[in-house]
Amino acid sequence: QFKISADRYIKEKSSIAVIGLSVHTAPVDMREKLAVAEELWPRAISELTSLNHIEEAAVLSTCNRMEIYVVALSWNRGIREVVDWMSKKSGIPASELREHLFMLRDSGATRHLFEVSAGLDSLVLGEGQILAQVKQVVRNGQNSGGLGKNIDRMFKDAITAGKRARCETNISAGAVSVSSAAVELAMMKLPKSECLSARMLLIGAGKMGKLVVKHLIAKGCKKVVVVNRSVERVDAIREEMKDIEIVYRPLTEMYEAAADADVVFTSTASESLLFTKEHAEALPPISLAMGGVRLFVDISVPRNVGACLSQVEHARVYNVDDLKEVVEANKEDRVRKAMEAQAIITQELKRFEAWRDSLETVPTIKKLRSYADRIRASELDKCLQKIGEDNLNKKTRRSIEELSTGIVNKLLHGPLQHLRCDGSDSRTLDETLDNMHALNRMFNLDTEKAVLEQKIKAKVEKTQS
């Protein structure tokens, strides 16, 4: 039955695919249902690779995107299994999910990841945080042993592309982050004359929260209240940023702190809402000098502030999707910078595809070496028997063994050179594959079916156990 299954896939090379949604394709209320906390990435990878047609997997989940990268033994079946997994996880029907998902294959999927890493697909062009998040996928995968060789190499090459794009072009010059865009949005909504006197509250002292404080300083703010579960992170921010007064308040005093704030920034990992309509209605009114409206700027995914707060007369809520208003400025300059970075991405893409193409011949190389070594060992044994063990000392025996190994290596050198397709010479992939198929026929290696049979057999046995 495994040979029948292998025959079905023999003409279809395994595909690299990305299935996901981002700030460009789906609203935040859908993205938050699919968000996977970083500590749960290994579990998600384990669940994905247990699917029948998924061989490798990685998860990239941020406030602006949720993307799953896989190596699928079958494109159609693999995609269907991943979409069903996403539907089951989020509770969103697969038919509804498909309206917002994007799906890219092979070079399209790889180029997309490289563009993501370079900050070209970000809401904020060239922002640096996404590169750190791509790096974290690799670190997480290495610690948990969850990444396969294709996905691991693709993400590492994406990091290289992201670094080169920032170093060799001016794409990150003047680039803002989600945190700085949030501060900019708040300043746009406040009365201009009152920006510096507005009472600022930050809930959450993580990486993005720290950046909020940094950009408030850049805007000239002199004081910010920070609510956090523990005081240690707030102390660390206070130690680093001397140009602003930072007042710590524990999580138990969050609503009291909000009552004394004109602008509330939220940036926590909480999976439940911190502020609902009822909370906003219970807060005291804001002075008319401040516009009479309390601003909630929520850069968390899942969201910390309910959208229903905007139904409250004296409250307005903005989430990550609303930051587009800030970053749409200088659109022409953004396009020009992106074009400069695309040339670098194309170079890195060619290198990765050459490496992946070269993997097709690896099973043939292993089979040919094994075949040659079996013949060498058999003939060596016959030779040693004819000579007789009594007539051989250790040095002579070792010399004969080295001679046989050397002859085999010399004979294999030419054929193996013609199985290389790593971009180091002018040989095309088609030429290399023709050589591979010729060797398969000449030596009856039958490599492709053997490899596919092993993969399918392992998958079937895993699901049946």
From Swiss-Prot:
Task: Please give the Gene Ontology molecular function terms for this protein.
Answer: glutamyl-tRNA reductase activity; NADP binding
Task: Please list the residues that bind NADP(+).
Answer: 204-209
Q: Where does it mainly reside? A: plastid
Question: Enzyme group, top EC level?
Answer: oxidoreductase
Give the signal sequence positions. none
* Alphabetical UniProt keywords: Chlorophyll biosynthesis, Chloroplast, NADP, Oxidoreductase, Plastid, Porphyrin biosynthesis
Q: Which InterPro entries match?
A: 4pyrrol_synth_GluRdtase, 4pyrrol_synth_GluRdtase_dimer, 4pyrrol_synth_GluRdtase_N, GluRdtase_CS, GluRdtase_dimer_dom_sf, GluRdtase_N_sf, NAD(P)-bd_dom_sf, Shikm_DH/Glu-tRNA_Rdtase
Q: Which Pfam families match?
A: GlutR_dimer, GlutR_N, Shikimate_DH
Which residues does the UniProt site feature Important for activity point to?
A: 112
Q: Binding residues for substrate, per the UniProt record?
A: 62-65, 122, 127-129, 133
Q: Where in the cell is it found?
A: Plastid, Chloroplast
* Keyword set includes Plastid: yes
Additional notes on this entry: During catalysis, the active site Cys acts as a nucleophile attacking the alpha-carbonyl group of tRNA-bound glutamate with the formation of a thioester intermediate between enzyme and glutamate, and the concomitant release of tRNA(Glu). The thioester intermediate is finally reduced by direct hydride transfer from NADPH, to form the product GSA.
- Specify the protein name: Glutamyl-tRNA reductase 2
